[in-house]
Amino acid sequence: LVLNRARLVGGAEAVPHWADRLAWPSKLHEGGPVSTDSIIGLGLGPDMPVEGISPLLGRLGVVDLHRDPLGLPDVEEVRLFAGYAGWTAGQLETEVAAGGWIVVDASEEDARTADPDGLWRIVLARQGGMVALLADYPDEPDLN
């Protein structure tokens, strides 16, 4: 999923029955260009596995948005994404091997940041070394 592109549409409009469980800012985010008519929810679940949330990292997991949220009382801070990013078989591995991506450890905080627009810089800055320098790279280097 692309984590840092909020849309103008409110998350409560997209999935009203989950409105009181949405993380702030409660916007529908662009998860990527594939299946943009589907909505994926990432949220925090309990420390132990429960039906209705597929664990990803720590307490972070994919939430079954078709379920009644009252049946998942321990699920909170849900962030909504329309669509997802996808690659053909072997494409991503080839791009990573060619140096086209910076691969870093994930943090459950990334998916629920209150500053999705600044997430790219936040993640790069915490890496340290040469990668951290990219966090301060200007959006338009030609204007620097």
Regions found by a protein language model. Name each.
Residues 1-81, 85-144:
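A short aromatic-anchored loop/beta-hairpin motif
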